[in-house]
A protein has these predicted regions:
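Long extracytoplasmic/lumenal interhelical loops at the membrane interface
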Residues: 63-79, 83-87, 91-130
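Helix-loop-helix junctions and helix-breaking kinks within/between transmembrane helices
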Residues: 1-22, 45-47, 131-134
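Hydrophobic transmembrane alpha-helices and their immediate junctions
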Residues: 15-19, 24, 28, 108, ...
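Alpha-helical transmembrane segments and their membrane-interface exit regions
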Residues: 14-21, 38-39, 61, 199-205
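Alpha-helical transmembrane segments
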Residues: 1, 5, 39-46, 138-142, ...
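A membrane-periplasm/extracellular boundary helix in multi-pass inner-membrane enzymes
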Residues: 1, 21-66, 77-87, 95
Length: 214
């Protein structure tokens, strides 16, 4: 489909499952190889997908063109979110108020395509709309997921202990990749996005409470 964010989520998930030692790792490597080959074949045969998935990505990353050509819309969203955060560092401007505050500032009104309903990045949205209070809560969750993932890898390598079973690793992958900071996202306060964020959390807590996969 040419949806780069979704493709990146899939790739990151596969790599997470590979680096989290489990009995299915070799099968995941095989599936990842098949996925990359399949996408490459489709991209070669479809110039529109090829241009969006590869050429446009390389251009915006500054590899084939000046980094200044990075998506002006996204760059504008990020800069505005940062400005709003600096003016309201502790509590932000309020949930779902990015649009209102952006349109109320004259300097932003003169810049096309920069005022939108949210800044298209979870952490920048939390900083601008909820300040440090909301940001640190979610960022702590992200760091916690990183910590227990590293703990699993360490115990598996050093003591040959399986800290998490494969189903739990999949749930961890879902939570961690959803909170990955360096990728465009939907609005954090959107209902369906919150299902993606928090439904796996409920499953993880249930598994932990029942001691089914630990």
């Amino acid at each position: 489909s040419g949806e780069r964010a979704a493709f990146l989520f899939v790739i990151l998930t596969f790599f997470y499952l590979i680096f989290m030692p489990n009995k299915f790792s070799k099968y995941i490597v095989f599936l990842l190889t098949i996925l990359i080959i399949t996408i490459s074949v489709f991209s070669i045969n479809d110039k529109k997908i090829s241009n969006r998935m590869f050429q446009q990505t390389l251009d915006q990353a500054g590899i084939t063109k000046d980094l200044g050509n990075f998506s002006l819309e996204h760059k504008g969203h990020y800069l505005i979110a940062w400005d709003l955060f600096k003016k309201n560092k502790f509590f932000g401007v309020g949930p779902k108020n990015f649009w209102n505050n952006c349109n109320n500032i004259l300097i932003y009104q003169k810049k096309p395509f920069v005022c939108t309903t949210h800044p298209h990045n979870t952490y920048l949205q939390l900083l601008s709309e909820t300040g440090f209070v909301g940001f640190l809560t979610i960022f702590y969750l992200f760091l916690f997921l990183c910590f227990i993932s590293i703990k699993h890898i360490y115990l598996k390598i050093t003591k040959q202990l399986q800290y998490f079973n494969f189903p739990t690793i999949c749930i961890l992958a879902s939570m961690l990749i959803s909170l990955w900071p360096l990728i465009p996202t939907g609005s954090f306060f959107n209902n369906y996005i919150n299902i993606i964020y928090f439904f796996p959390v409920g499953i993880f807590l249930w598994l932990n409470d029942e001691k089914k996969f630990f």
